[in-house]
Design a protein with these regions (language model features):
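Solvent-exposed interaction patches of small proteins and small membrane subunits
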Residues: 1-145
Length: 145
């Protein structure tokens, strides 16, 4: 049986949450706040990439081939996750929005995209924590106990 280690994802979530708290506590418009905003945007990207790597590993446990998964678009991976009960369809739709935002911020670090990313943070943190919990429960070292 394949076991997933979600510790790296949990660490990314912790770091992203801390960056968001520091951003919110910083003086409005300060350089410090801008630094924390940038940390939130990068943390958002890293947390997503870590989650998608884990999803690929999880989908292998459901019989999907590694080579095929490596070439499968992210949105299709998310749909597959729903088919296997790792996410709900509503969660998949929200993850589509997170992915679209991440793709936009990767090409344009403008303030508008950063503010959109910040707006998504509360829901994203809730969804990624839930995903980590599902993966840990279903495929983690303690799964099935």
């Amino acid at each position: 049986m394949l076991y997933l280690n979600v510790e790296q994802l949990e660490r990314c979530i912790q770091t992203l949450s801390a960056s968001l708290s520091l951003y919110q506590a910083a003086e409005e418009g300060s350089t410090e706040q801008e630094v924390f905003r940038n940390a939130v945007v990068k943390g958002f990207e890293l947390t997503q990439e870590t989650a998608f790597k884990l999803l690929k590993k999880a989908l292998k446990a459901f019989g999907h081939g590694a080579r095929k998964l490596e070439t499968t678009p992210i949105k299709d991976l998310l749909r597959m996750a729903a088919v296997h009960g790792l996410m709900t369809l509503d969660e998949v739709e929200r993850w589509f929005a997170y992915r679209d935002n991440r793709n936009n911020t990767a090409h344009d670090y403008g303030e508008g995209f950063a503010h959109e990313t910040l707006r998504l943070m509360p829901a994203f943190l809730e969804d990624v924590r839930h995903l980590a919990g599902v993966l840990k429960h279903r495929l983690g070292q303690d799964a099935g106990e």
